[in-house]
């Protein structure tokens, strides 16, 4: 939803990475919800004008042609929980006519590194007042991330942003032939309790 749904009023971490997620029971519910939220906002300079009025109607019509998706088993596949692996293997088997399995592009291995630089640098900037005034009240992992963010050089950050832009540009062609990409978003189900949300 980056550039489509405004982040105004939401705690800012990174203007380059922050985006609002939309959830619903059905695809139609998500379309109706998103249609309402998609607006140009002068307070969020990343938002753009986007015609979403017919989103629900288009969604109800279904796909124009048989949907095709790409599935990547990334370098982190071996770290993923057995339960999650089984779930994805089942998905691939059930929808094998719609999902093609590919090796990830070589530059994918650098994404976590550059993402971390952008995220932590922006977070250090966004949370600097909290860090200065209430460091002892903040979580250990958050403090460590902010302190790493304070140490990256300007070149580190510029290189990371350039990598992100080039990656988007290189990968955009994929969506001319495929509806989307399927890949695990985390290593598994979040830990029980409120102490942790699991692996980032």
Which residues fall in each region the model found?
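Short helix-loop capping/hinge segments that flank enzyme active sites or metal/cofactor-binding pockets
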Residues: 63-72, 114-172
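A short helix-breaking turn/cap at a secondary-structure junction
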Residues: 2-85
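Acyltransferase
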Residues: 54-56, 80-104, 127-133, 157, ...
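Flexible, glycine/charged-enriched surface loops at secondary-structure junctions
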Residues: 42-48, 97-106
């Amino acid at each position: 939803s980056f550039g489509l749904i405004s982040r105004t009023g939401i705690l800012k971490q990174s203007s380059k990475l922050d985006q609002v997620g939309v959830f619903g029971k059905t695809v139609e519910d998500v379309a109706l919800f998103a249609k309402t939220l998609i607006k140009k906002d002068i307070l969020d300079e990343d938002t753009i004008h986007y015609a979403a009025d017919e989103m629900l109607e288009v969604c109800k019509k279904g796909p124009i042609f048989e949907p095709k998706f790409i599935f990547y088993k990334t370098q982190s596949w071996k770290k993923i929980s057995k339960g999650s692996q089984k779930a994805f293997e089942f998905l691939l088997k059930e929808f094998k006519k719609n999902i093609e399995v590919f090796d990830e592009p070589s530059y994918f291995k650098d994404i976590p590194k550059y993402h971390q630089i952008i995220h932590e640098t922006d977070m250090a900037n966004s949370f600097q007042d909290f860090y200065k005034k209430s460091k002892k009240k903040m979580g250990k992992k958050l403090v460590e991330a902010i302190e790493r963010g304070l140490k990256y050089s300007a070149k580190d950050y510029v290189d990371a942003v350039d990598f992100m832009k080039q990656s988007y540009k290189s990968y955009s062609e994929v969506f001319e032939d495929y509806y989307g990409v399927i890949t695990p978003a985390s290593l598994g189900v979040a830990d029980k309790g409120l102490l942790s949300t699991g692996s980032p």
